[in-house]
Swiss-Prot record:
Identification of the protein by name: L-aspartate:5-guanidino-3-methyl-2-oxopentanoate transaminase
InterPro entries given in the database record: 3metArgNH2trans, Aminotransferase_I/II_large, AspAT/PAT-like, PyrdxlP-dep_Trfase, PyrdxlP-dep_Trfase_major
GO molecular function, one term: pyridoxal phosphate binding
Family recorded in the similarity comment: Belongs to the class-I pyridoxal-phosphate-dependent aminotransferase family.
Length: 387
C-alpha cells in the first residue's frame, strides 16, 4: 500500500554511508532527544536496581594485556563454557577479542590463510548484514541458504556447499529468527563438514537466552578434533554490556595461536580495564538480565496474540521477534513511526537475505518501555498497515 501521511517524514537517505538503523538513531538523538522511544536494541537492558558494577583494577590501565587475553578473563570464560556445555576445554582454546564481530573477522581471515584462494562461504539467511560484508571484504564468494524453518537439515546445508567452500557460518540462537538447532543436527553436521574439509563457524552471542529449559549442544562436544571448529561469543548480548567491546573465540590451540598473532599485529591487545570488568561481570552472572528478558517476552507474547498473531509468534530463544508487518514500504513505515510517533524501529534493512516487510520487536527492554513502545506501534499499525 502507499502510506497516506498527513505529513511525510523521510528520514533515511539512500545515498548515506551509514546504515538505515544508524541514520534513524542519529535523527532521534539530534532531533527528538529525550522524547524518542528507542525500541531497536536486541541487546537486553539490565533492570535499574539490578545493574551490576563490575570490578576494575586501579592499575590495569598501566600495562598491556597478553595478546591472547588477560588470564583472569580467559579462566572465567573457559569455566563458563565448560560448565554451560559440559566441555573440557583449556585456556589455550580461547582468545579474547574486541567484541564478537572482531572475533568473526579474525576467524574468517584465519580460515582464508589455509588456502591459496578464499573460495566460498555459506551463510544462513536472513543474517546480520555486517557478517556477509566481512566475508566479502575478506574475499569469499557468498552462498546464501534461505531459512524456512527453525534450523535447516544437514542435507540442505551440504547441498549448497561447493567444491571451493571453505566455511559454513551459523548463528544460533538465530538472529533475527530466534530458532535453535537439535542435538541430532549438530552431531551430524560436525563430521559431515569435517569430511569435506569445511570449517564450521558458530556464532553463539545469544546463548544465555534459550527458554523453556531447552539447550543446544556445543560442536566441541561432537569431536576431539577442533581444528575445523570455531565458536564466537561476547558479553554484549549475553551480559548486556556492549560498551565493554569484549568477545571471545574458541577453537583448537593452533588456531587460537594463529589468531592471537593477527590480533597482536592489529591492536597489540584488547583493552585491559575492559577485560577486568568483563571477568568480574561474567563471574557475577546474568540472572537478573535473563529474568528481564523473560518478563518482556511475556508482554510481547500477549501483544502478538492480540494484534499480530497472523504475522509472528514468540521464538524459543534470542532477544527479539522478527515480525513481517502488513505494509508495502517498511522503510517508509519506520520513518513515519519515528517522525510522527517518536518510535525508533529496526527493520529488515539490518539484515542480508531478509525477505518481506520485517521489523524486530525487542524482548529485552524494561516492562515500562516495552508497554509504551508496543502501544505506539499498535497505533501506527492501526493507522498505516494494510490490514
Amino acid at each position: 500500500m502507499t502510506l497516506a501521511y498527513n505529513k511525510r517524514h523521510q528520514i533515511v537517505r539512500p545515498d548515506s554511508c551509514l546504515s538505515v538503523l544508524q541514520q534513524r538513531l542519529k535523527y532521534a538523538r539530534s532531533e527528538l532527544q529525550e522524547s524518542a522511544c528507542y525500541f531497536v536494541e536486541n541487546v537486553p537492558v539490565w533492570p535499574g536496581a539490578a545493574a551490576p558494577t563490575p570490578f576494575a583494577a586501579s592499575t590495569d590501565i598501566f600495562q598491556h594485556a597478553d595478546c591472547n587475553g588477560a588470564p583472569p578473563l580467559i579462566n572465567t570464560i573457559c569455566a563458563r563454557d565448560n560448565a554451560l556445555y559440559g566441555l573440557d576445554l583449556s585456556d589455550e582454546n580461547f582468545l579474547v577479542t574486541n567484541g564478537g564481530m572482531h572475533g568473526l573477522s579474525l576467524v574468517f581471515r584465519q580460515i582464508k590463510r589455509r588456502s591459496a584462494e578464499a573460495g566460498s562461504a555459506v551463510c544462513l539467511a536472513p543474517v546480520f548484514g555486517a557478517v556477509p560484508a566481512l566475508l566479502e571484504a575478506t574475499g569469499y564468494d557468498l552462498i546464501y541458504y534461505q531459512m524456512s524453518a527453525a534450523f535447516p537439515t544437514v542435507e540442505e546445508i551440504l547441498a549448497v556447499c561447493r567444491a571451493d567452500t571453505r566455511l559454513v557460518y551459523l548463528n544460533f540462537p538465530h538472529n533475527p529468527l530466534g530458532g535453535i538447532y537439535s542435538d541430532a543436527f549438530i552431531e551430524q553436521l560436525v563430521p559431515s563438514l569435517a569430511e569435506r574439509g569445511i570449517s564450521l563457524v558458530l556464532d553463539m552471542v545469544y546463548d544465555s537466552f534459550i527458554f523453556d529449559d531447552q539447550k543446544i549442544r556445543s560442536p566441541f562436544a561432537c569431536t576431539n578434533d577442533l581444528s575445523l571448529l570455531y565458536t564466537v561469543n561476547s558479553v554484549s548480548k549475553n551480559y548486556g554490556s556492549p560498551g565493554l567491546r569484549i568477545g571471545w573465540v574458541a577453537s583448537s590451540s593452533d588456531n587460537v595461536e594463529a589468531m592471537a598473532g593477527m590480533l597482536e599485529i592489529e591492536c597489540v591487545a584488547v583493552c585491559s580495564p575492559a577485560q577486568t570488568k568483563a571477568a568480574s561481570l561474567i563471574s557475577m552472572g546474568n540472572a537478573p538480565l535473563h529474568q528481564q528478558v523473560v518478563s518482556s517476552r511475556a508482554i510481547v507474547r500477549e501483544f502478538l496474540g492480540r494484534h499480530l498473531s497472523r504475522y509472528a509468534s514468540l521464538p524459543p530463544a534470542g532477544t527479539q521477534v522478527f515480525v513481517n508487518l502488513p505494509v508495502h514500504d517498511i522503510e517508509g513505515f519506520a520513518d513515519q513511526m519515528l517522525g510522527e510517533y517518536g518510535l525508533v524501529l529496526a527493520t529488515a534493512s539490518n539484515y542480508s537475505g531478509a525477505q518481506g516487510a520485517h521489523i524486530r520487536i525487542p524482548t529485552g527492554y524494561p516492562e515500562s518501555i516495552t508497554h509504551n513502545a508496543l502501544e505506539l506501534l499498535r497505533q501506527g499499525i492501526e493507522r498505516y498497515a494494510d490490514v
